[in-house]
Amino acid sequence: EKYDDAESASDFAVDMVNQVVDGLKGVNFAVHLCRRAGARVRGELQHEGGYGPIINQLNRLRVHHLTMEFTAPGAGDMAVFKKIREDFEIGLGCVSCTPGQIDTPRQIVKRVQPALEYLDPSRVTLNPDCGFAPGSAADVSIDEVYAKLQHEVEAARQLRDQYG
């Protein structure tokens, strides 16, 4: 869908999130920037374009952690991290949710390394691009989910060995 005024709509969304978290102390908040991974698997509308056009809105969010999907085609360049607030932790979507596609630890490491050109490793957590959508048309078996997460853990070990 197109919005008549995307800038205004995204500003409104940020204001709403900030109102939700306003006044709550001692809690870390996260926002997931969904690229509709399950919809891609089902062959539905794909969202293309990087995070650059919404960087100003992201930087206004009063949250601690952003999860950003980067396995999707058209997710944009990781150079966007040059412009992201330095106090954000980044949950880097680096494991595909696509059924039948199990990324190797090496593939995952290769997806993460470009982000580390811009982000201190202490700010990065690894995560799947999105949830594994149990019960949806993009259903991933529990055994496959386990294998995907095992490979994510192994990639994290390799990255810790390399980057500290």
Go through each PLM region and give its residues.
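Domain-level signal for soluble alpha/beta catalytic cores
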Residues: E1-G164
